[in-house]
From Swiss-Prot:
Organism: Neisseria meningitidis serogroup C (strain 053442)
Gene this protein is translated from: prfA
Free-text function comment from the UniProt entry: Peptide chain release factor 1 directs the termination of translation in response to the peptide chain termination codons UAG and UAA.
GO cellular component term of the entry, any: cytoplasm
Record SMART domains: PCRF
Protein name, per record: Peptide chain release factor 1
NCBIfam families to which the protein is assigned, alphabetical: prfA, PRK00591.1
Amino acid sequence: MKPSILEKLQQLGDRLEEVTHLLGQPEATADMDNYRKLTREHAELTPVVEVFQNYRLAQSDLADAEEMLSDPEMKDFAAEEIEAAKAKIGALDTELQKLLLPKDADDDKNIFIEVRAGTGGDEAALFAGDLLRMYSRYAERNRWQVEIVSANESELGGYKEVIARIIGLGAYSRLKFESGGHRVQRVPATESQGRIHTSACTVAVMPEADELEDIELNPVDLRIDTFRASGAGGQHINKTDSAVRITHLPTGMVVECQDGRSQHANKAQAMKVLAARLNDAQKREAQAKEAAERKSLIGSGDRSERIRTYNYPQGRVTDHRINLTLHKLDFVMDGDLAEITDALIAEHQAELLAAMGD
């Protein structure tokens, strides 16, 4: 292990002792904001320090075993102990490096997930509906809530565009690598000749901003229009102008919300989505710069990149970023995404570890 990392771990151990002492003081709860901050820091430091303690114990065991090598009667036993200690040190070293990886401040946040139909017309819209169901079923498996924020339905079913809010601890950490182009290859229900068509959708996953204050929304930069909410095919479904369209003039971003019960609710939701989009745009710009520097395949934030193909005739799903192919399409479309998300997270961690080693 690098001396700089050992020094960092020693500093974290000292800091944990300091935080533990501060939390034990009678006046610790006088300032509840600071108390919560210290409690959170204690929870973050404890696992790192515990693993580091185990690492040092394993090093001590290795040193003891190496001393026994000089005793002819203990030589075989010592060799076994040395091998076991080295294996343990290697595993703990890897675990410590992962624990020291920079944390994404957005990982625990709720998300907005946008699915837009691309090339393929009605079939792309149907696939957008399938993707929304896939993410909704995945959310159910994790006991997260799903709310439809805005939906532009197509006449044959599915969505031209749909925005959902997924509420649950860690939603962003598990789904942030879903952003990008998703391609489907299958025989559409409307295809009489049985020919396979290729369609595409774009997915965008954005962490929900904690508060609107996270992004400064100057009223001068906003144009707010109201109109009547409409259903599939464009028919109006109410008689009041409850739907809201907000245009962010400096960037040209447009957000529409019409699924709320009132104009006020739709405006509030639209402002949240706009804040998330602006936050996300800033984050993607930074990610793209970092990714270019380290030639990253994961987490570049490039929405134009085709990241996954869903091939129905072959029953397979392929994630092109990590060359992962699974022959369990039905399960994946029913929300069984764990194998894919775990592999993407592992690859991202490997990239970060490689960057630490540079």
